[in-house]
Amino acid sequence: MGNLKTLLESRFKKNTPTKMEALARKRMEGDPSPLAVRLSNPTLSSKEKEQLRHLLQHYNFREQIEEPDLTQLCTLSAEVKQIHHQSVLLHGERITKVRDLLKSYREGAFSSWLLLTYGNRQTPYNFLVYYELFTLLPEPLKIEMEKMPRQAVYTLASRQGPQEKKEEIIRNYRGERKSELLDRIRKEFPLVETDCRKTSPVKQALAMLTKGSQILTKCTSLSSDEQIILEKLIKKLEKVKSNLFPDTKV
């Protein structure tokens, strides 16, 4: 019995470190996962650095800002942005693996998993398309894509269209605001008529008015400024109504 115990202990001591070392060596030599990437030397654009400089100047107690503070703030801000970028890729990679795993199951399994795990479908879908676009890009454009507003990248990744045109938008990015970039993406990649995401501006406006009226219905009183704004809005709506229904008495 003693010999058996000694034999088992010696085998355990012999094999366990070997497995641990093999796993560590695999990580060090480079796991094929595309996400053992780049938290090295994160940087901000000159525009972002200038925005942080203005922030320190605005909230500074002294006349001059401390340059070491600005340098550290820029470094930390760049690291935070890259950590967020890295987390999106990690989500996207796992979601892709789950989608592949559930392909052999009945339709709806993947959607149910998204709802069970994330509570909605839109957030993980954004992660998924972001990851898919990122993995298709050449290395220099991956760096440029990281600099773009996240919402703009989600929109670009989700649109149907040539990969070359998507790469061109990323290549030509020059620090534009999110709204400008979204306008360009929507112009280059318009939604098809059958796309459920396509909503007419009129429907959007009516939905906002409906929501606003529901909120106002619950109000018991308005301030004088709010009354003035509401009266102006009612007059504008009356004008819209008379233009759309000219034969209807207001």
UniProtKB/Swiss-Prot annotation:
InterPro entries assigned: UPF0137
A family per Pfam: UPF0137
Family affiliation: Belongs to the UPF0137 (pGP6-D) family.
Name of the molecule in the record: Virulence plasmid protein pGP6-D-related protein
Organism in which the protein naturally occurs: Chlamydia pneumoniae (Chlamydophila pneumoniae)
